[in-house]
Amino acid sequence: MSKGIKMHNSVMRLTIPNKKIINYAPHIVTSIILFFICQQLAQLTWKIILPVNFTDNALSSADMTSPAAPSAETALPRFTLFGLAEKTSASAPGGNLDQAPVSALRLRVTGLLASTDPSRAIAIMMKGNQQVSLGIGDNTPGGEAKIIAISPDRLIVNYRGRNEAIPLFNDPPAVGKNSAAPPARHLAQELRAQPQNILHYLNISPVMVNDKLSGYRLNPGKDPALFRQSGLRENDLAIALNGLDLRDKEQARQVLAQLPELTEITLTVERDGQKNDIYLALRDE
């Protein structure tokens, strides 16, 4: 390739199911990248610049809520996404919402953005074949229940006077043939339960320039094989996903809304001063 070319495309395809886990490398690494970037976007959305240290399990509720020295600036809401063992917003009506039973309503939650400011919390739910963004006080698709609280891993609704919980990714159990989940899904479940395990596969750190997010630095973790199989290289700087700028709050929210439906992914990274598109086709044929 000549030095004058500014773009480079790396193509990886996932087509053969039930092979060794390395065949799922693009899917797995992409799942990790999306999971962690969403975590970071949630924390950095409102320009709260907090150092991330996964070795100290920075995603635990203790770290996220530990007292800080008073600031001269007005306190901004903190956001979390997926898996934080954070208490449900105290401003929500009702009793102990953590004890709300799982709802039998056939509703699917595909994304949650929890906030210490309830008015800024967002739930993404399926409505037919489309996804809608809802907040506390809104009715669920179909109007059967009303949203009263949004937690990092569940939605609390009031249905016929009773508080019920709708878990994130509330998929009905698969029936029929062998329905074992692919490694990428197992990995996503593992990371939601133990986010610190990301370090085994990938190190991602936000890069700030003049107090502005300029991208996410990607490096291999303790298990570098999956990182290299995906087409990534050390010190790649992720800046966009499917043409949406990961550094922009509104575009990042669009990425979050699209995550459950993505089948093809183009991750744009800066490498040695040039932009590179890494194409990942996530197909089971």
Swiss-Prot record:
UniProt key word Transmembrane: yes
Periplasmic side of membrane: 47-285
Localization terms from the record: Cell inner membrane
Gene3D superfamilies per record: 2.30.30.830, 2.30.42.10
Membrane topology designation: Single-pass membrane protein
Location (main, coarse): membrane
InterPro entries: PDZ_sf (IPR036034), T2SS_GspC_N (IPR024961), T2SS_protein-GspC (IPR001639)
Cytoplasmic compartment segments: 1-27
Entry's Gene Ontology cellular component terms: plasma membrane; type II protein secretion system complex
Transmembrane segments: 28-46
SUPFAM superfamilies in the cross-refs: PDZ domain-like
Key words, A-Z: Cell inner membrane, Cell membrane, Membrane, Protein transport, Transmembrane, Transmembrane helix, Transport
GO terms for biological process, alphabetical: protein secretion by the type II secretion system
Biological role: Involved in a type II secretion system (T2SS, formerly general secretion pathway, GSP) for the export of proteins. Required for the translocation of pullulanase.
Family named by the database record: Belongs to the GSP C family.
The protein's name: Type II secretion system protein C
Organism: Klebsiella pneumoniae
Gene responsible for this protein: pulC
